[in-house]
C-alpha cells in the first residue's frame, strides 16, 4: 500500500477515499423565475394579470323597453300586446310560437269585443302555423281556431274561409303524416262552419277530364293521398290498374282519425233526408211516392233558385243518357257509386282487420278498433244509401222498380264478410243497426229475399225502453223490410211496433214512431202500391188509433207549457198538427182495411173532449189547450170535430 492505494498485480491500482465524502453545495430557493425575453418580442403579461378590456355592441330591444308606456294598451298577463304576440308567431323557438298563440287566445277570452276589432290580425297571424313542425304548436293552433270560429258569425268569417281552407289542404298534403293528421282537427271546424264551401264541387276529384279546382276537390284528393288509394282521375292519368293499392302505412289511431274526418266530409255532402228511402220501391207511380214522402213534413216557403253545378255529369254523359235512356234501365254511375268503388278495397281490408278485435268471442273488446269499425260502416252506409236510392229514383223516372246496379257485387261481398260477425246478438248495438240497413239496401236493390235473422233482435229492441230516437229512425228501413217480406215473425214485429208505441215517454221518439206508424196506416190508400202489406193487418191498430188523443193532449199541454224550451215547444206543436191531420184523414175515409172505422170514430169523440174543456169537480169547466193554439191549428181541430160526434 502506498499512500492509500493498493497495488495488485492484475487489476492495477484501486483508489478509494479513506477520508469522509465531501458535501455538495445547495442553491437557495427562488421565488420568481425571470423569463428570458426573445429578441423582437414584446413584454409578456404576467400569468396572474387581469384583463380589463371590454367590447361593446349595439342591440335593439323594442319589446323590452322599460320606457314604453303600456298602461292604456290591451295586454296579457305577461304584459304582451297583440303586436308583440304577432311578432312572436315567427320566432324560431316552438315554445315561443305556442305561447304567442295562447297569448292571443287569452286576449280573445279576456276582452269583450277584441275579436271583432282585430279579427284580421288574429286569424292571419295563426294561419301559417297550421302546418307547423312542432306538435304542441299545432295543438295550440287547433284549440285557438276552435274558439275563434265558435265566436265569429258566418258573415265575419267569410273573407277568411278560402285562405284557411287552402292552408288546411296544404297541411293535409304535408310530407309528415303527423302534420296531416293534426290538420284534420281544423278541417272538422271548417266543415261545421262553412260546409258548402268546404265540399264545393267535390265530385270533380273523381273525373279525370274536369278542369275544376275547388276546395271540395282538393280536400277529397288529400283524403285519397292519406288513405293511399287511387282515384279514377289518377288511374286514368297514370294508367294504373283499377284495383286500389295502399301505399301508406297507418296506425289504428291515425286511420281512425282519417276515417272519422272522411265520414264527416261525406255527411256534409249528403244533407238530404233518407229516412223514407226504403219506400221508393213500394210505389209504381212517382207522384204517389212524392206525396207519401211529403206526409207530415213541415210546410216550406218558396225556395229561392240557386245556381249549382250538375254533379258528376259531363255534357257528353248527359247526351248519352238522353239518347239511350229510353232503352236502358241502367242509370249512369253517380259520384257516390264511383267513390265506393275506389274506397271499397281499402275500407274492407281495414274492417276485416278490426272486426276480430271488436266481436271477440271471449268478450274482450278493443275500443279503438270498435270505433274504427263503426266509422267504416258509417261511410259504407252513407255511400251505399246514396248509390241505391239514386238508382231507384232513376228507375222510378222510367216507370220501373227493377234497376241494375253495377257495383252491387261489392255490397254483396261486404255483407258476406259481415254475416258471421252479426249472426248473434252482441253489445255493439249500433253496428248491428248499420248492418241491418245495409241488408235492407241490398234486398231492395236486388228484389230478392235475403236471409235476415234480425227478427229476434228487433223484438228484443222493441221490448227495451232505452231505445233512442236516432236508433229508432235508423231501424225504420229494417222494420219496413221485415213487415213487407214474407218471412217468419214479420207479423210479430208489426204487433211489437204498435205495442211499443204505448210505452214511449221520450217526446222525440214518440213523434218519430207516430209518423212512421201513421205512414204505414196510409199505405192502403195509394193505388200504385205494389208492396206486400199482409203483415200490417192486426187488431192492435184499433188500440193504437184510440191512443192518439192521449198523445195529442200530452203534446198540446207541453207546447204551451212554460217549462218547454222554444225548440221543444215548436216540436210539440208540430206533433199536434200532425196528429190532427192524420185523424182528419182517417175520419174522411169511408172505411179502412186495418181497423173498424165506425167503432174508431165513435170512440174518438169523447177522447177529444179534454182538448176543448175539462170538467173540474170543484172549479167547474176549465178551458183546454185548444184555446192557446194558433188559429190554423184551431181550424184543423174544428174540421176534425165536424167529422166525428160533437164533443
Question: Model regions: which residues?
Answer:
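Long alpha-helical repeat scaffolds
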Residues: 344, 348, 352-647
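Alpha-solenoid helical repeat scaffolds
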Residues: 52-127, 131-159, 331-354, 358, ...
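Fungal eukaryote-biased detector of long internal structured cores
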Residues: 124, 131, 135-136, 141-278, ...
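Hydrophobic residues within the alpha-helices of tandem HEAT/HEAT-like
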Residues: 89, 100-111, 129-130, 141-152, ...
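Boundary/linker elements of alpha-helical solenoid repeat scaffolds
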Residues: 57-72, 101-113, 142-154, 191-210, ...
Amino acid at each position: 500500500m502506498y499512500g492509500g492505494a493498493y497495488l495488485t498485480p492484475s487489476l492495477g491500482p484501486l483508489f478509494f477515499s479513506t477520508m469522509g465524502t465531501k458535501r455538495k453545495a445547495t442553491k437557495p430557493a427562488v421565488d420568481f423565475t425571470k423569463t428570458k425575453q426573445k429578441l423582437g418580442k414584446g413584454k409578456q403579461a404576467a400569468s396572474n394579470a387581469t384583463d380589463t378590456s371590454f367590447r361593446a355592441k349595439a342591440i335593439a330591444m323594442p319589446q323590452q323597453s322599460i320606457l314604453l308606456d303600456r298602461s292604456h294598451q290591451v295586454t296579457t298577463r305577461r304584459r304582451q300586446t297583440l303586436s308583440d304576440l304577432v311578432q312572436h308567431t315567427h320566432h324560431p323557438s316552438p315554445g315561443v310560437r305556442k305561447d304567442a298563440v295562447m297569448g292571443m287566445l287569452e286576449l280573445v277570452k279576456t276582452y269583450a269585443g277584441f275579436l271583432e276589432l282585430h279579427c284580421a290580425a288574429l286569424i292571419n297571424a295563426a294561419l301559417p302555423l297550421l302546418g307547423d313542425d312542432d306538435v304542441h304548436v299545432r295543438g295550440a293552433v287547433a284549440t285557438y281556431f276552435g274558439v275563434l270560429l265558435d265566436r265569429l258569425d258566418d258573415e265575419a268569417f267569410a273573407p277568411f274561409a278560402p285562405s284557411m281552407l287552402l292552408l288546411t289542404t296544404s297541411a293535409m298534403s304535408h310530407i309528415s303524416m303527423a302534420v296531416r293528421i293534426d290538420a284534420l282537427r281544423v278541417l272538422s271546424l271548417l266543415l261545421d262552419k262553412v260546409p258548402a264551401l268546404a265540399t264545393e264541387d267535390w265530385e270533380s276529384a273523381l273525373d279525370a277530364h274536369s278542369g275544376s279546382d275547388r276546395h271540395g276537390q282538393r280536400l277529397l284528393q288529400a283524403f285519397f293521398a292519406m288513405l293511399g288509394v287511387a282515384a279514377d282521375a289518377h288511374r286514368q292519368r297514370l294508367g294504373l290498374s283499377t284495383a286500389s293499392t295502399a301505399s301508406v302505412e297507418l296506425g289504428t289511431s291515425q286511420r281512425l282519425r282519417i276515417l272519422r274526418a272522411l265520414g264527416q266530409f261525406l255527411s256534409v255532402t249528403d244533407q238530404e233526408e233518407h229516412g223514407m228511402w226504403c219506400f221508393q220501391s213500394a210505389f209504381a207511380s212517382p207522384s204517389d211516392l212524392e206525396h207519401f214522402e211529403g206526409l207530415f213534413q213541415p210546410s216550406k216557403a218558396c225556395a229561392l233558385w240557386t245556381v249549382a253545378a250538375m254533379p258528376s255529369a259531363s255534357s257528353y254523359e248527359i247526351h248519352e243518357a238522353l239518347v239511350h235512356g229510353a232503352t236502358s234501365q241502367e242509370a249512369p254511375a253517380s259520384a257516390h257509386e264511383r267513390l265506393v268503388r275506389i274506397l271499397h278495397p281499402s275500407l274492407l281490408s281495414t274492417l276485416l282487420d278490426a272486426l276480430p278485435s271488436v266481436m271477440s268471442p271471449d268478450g274482450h273488446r278493443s275500443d279503438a278498433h270498435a270505433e274504427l269499425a263503426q266509422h267504416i260502416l258509417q261511410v259504407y252506409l252513407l255511400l251505399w244509401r246514396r248509390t241505391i236510392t239514386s238508382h231507384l229514383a232513376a228507375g222510378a223516372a222510367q216507370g220501373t222498380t227493377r234497376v241494375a246496379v253495377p257495383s252491387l257485387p261489392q255490397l254483396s261481398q261486404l255483407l258476406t264478410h259481415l254475416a258471421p260477425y252479426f249472426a248473434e246478438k252482441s253489445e255493439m248495438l249500433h253496428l248491428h243497426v248499420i248492418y241491418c240497413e245495409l241488408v235492407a239496401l241490398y234486398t231492395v236493390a236486388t228484389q230478392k229475399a235475403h236471409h235476415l235473422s234480425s227478427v229476434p233482435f228487433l223484438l228484443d229492441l222493441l221490448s227495451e225502453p232505452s231505445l233512442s230516437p236516432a236508433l229508432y229512425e235508423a231501424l225504420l228501413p229494417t222494420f219496413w223490410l221485415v213487415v213487407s217480406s214474407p218471412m217468419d215473425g214479420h207479423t210479430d214485429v208489426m204487433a211489437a211496433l204498435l205495442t211499443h208505441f204505448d210505452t214511449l215517454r221520450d217526446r222525440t221518439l214518440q213523434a218519430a214512431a207516430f209518423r212512421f206508424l201513421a205512414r204505414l196506416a196510409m199505405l192502403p190508400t195509394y193505388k200504385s202500391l205494389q208492396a206486400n202489406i199482409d203483415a200490417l193487418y192486426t187488431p192492435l191498430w184499433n188500440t193504437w188509433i184510440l191512443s192518439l188523443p192521449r198523445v195529442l193532449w200530452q203534446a198540446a199541454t207541453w207546447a204551451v207549457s212554460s217549462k218547454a224550451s222554444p225548440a221543444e215547444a215548436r216540436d210539440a206543436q208540430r206533433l199536434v198538427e200532425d196528429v190532427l191531420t192524420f185523424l182528419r184523414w182517417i175520419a174522411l175515409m169511408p172505411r179502412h182495411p186495418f181497423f173498424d172505422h165506425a167503432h174508431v170514430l165513435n170512440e174518438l169523440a169523447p177522447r177529444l173532449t179534454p182538448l176543448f174543456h175539462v170538467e173540474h169537480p170543484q172549479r167547474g169547466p176549465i178551458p183546454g189547450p185548444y184555446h192557446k193554439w194558433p188559429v190554423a191549428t184551431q181550424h184543423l181541430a174544428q174540421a176534425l170535430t165536424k167529422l166525428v160526434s160533437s164533443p
